[in-house]
């Protein structure tokens, strides 16, 4: 006795195959949606982390930072911020792992923006200067040997970046910041 396969495959027409292809999202479209979702998630998480870490930092009027850089330059951040251009204040440390990613961006911004950095718990001026020379960084550095600047500012995370314009804090970022993110913060200050 012969058994026949009672389930015959239906003949597919060209119209059917076109319909099935249009119903299936393309891989590019699928990956695009995934990428947008990931960017949104990372953006929201980054914003939440900035908010969480900056809670102890001042809001509104900037806390004065007045001192002499390790390069011998007198610096008054509030006065610098009153010329209509924002000042990028960069709190960092020579031992900070995340600062390795942010410091090159800060150094490149030093050519076109006002930058003042504050080195936290990084040792004597000579050690900080050797670090700057080894990395070929040329942004101004105030060495916070006593820790009073970081205490006044409530800094508990390095790196931390504060944008100040006209004596007011316009933006605070903690952790790794992209060049585009920093540029946008200064642009909208």
Task: Please state what every model-predicted region is.
Residues 68, 140-144:
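Short acidic-hydrophobic, aromatic-tinged amphipathic segments that line or gate anion-handling sites
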Residues 100-135, 145-151:
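Structural microenvironment flanking redox-active thiols in thiol-disulfide oxidoreductases
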Residues 84-87, 91-95, 157:
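Short pre-active-site segment immediately N-terminal to redox-active cysteine/selenocysteine motifs
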Residues 133-137, 145-189:
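Thiol/disulfide oxidoreductase modules built on the thioredoxin-like
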Residues 88-89, 115, 161:
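Hydrophobic beta-strand anchors of alpha/beta hydrolase catalytic cores
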Residues 80-84, 103-113, 134-135, 181-189:
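Alpha-helix C-terminal capping segments
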């Amino acid at each position: 006795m012969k058994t026949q396969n009672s389930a015959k495959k239906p003949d597919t027409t060209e119209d059917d195959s076109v319909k099935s292809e249009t119903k299936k999202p393309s891989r590019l479209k699928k990956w695009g949606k995934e990428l947008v979702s990931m960017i949104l998630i990372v953006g929201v998480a980054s914003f939440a982390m900035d908010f969480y870490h900056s809670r102890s930092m001042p809001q509104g009027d900037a806390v004065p930072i007045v001192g002499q850089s390790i390069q011998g330059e007198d610096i008054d951040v509030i006065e610098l911020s009153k010329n209509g251009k924002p000042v990028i204040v960069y709190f960092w440390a020579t031992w900070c792992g995340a600062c390795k990613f942010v410091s090159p961006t800060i150094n490149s911004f030093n050519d076109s923006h006002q930058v003042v950095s504050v080195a936290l718990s990084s040792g004597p001026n000579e050690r900080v200067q050797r670090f700057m020379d080894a990395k070929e960084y040329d942004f101004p550095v105030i060495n916070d040997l006593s820790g009073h600047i970081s205490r006044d500012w409530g800094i508990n995370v390095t790196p931390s970046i504060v944008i100040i314009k006209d004596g007011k804090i316009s933006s605070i970022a903690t952790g790794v910041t992209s060049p585009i993110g920093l540029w946008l913060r200064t642009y909208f200050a």
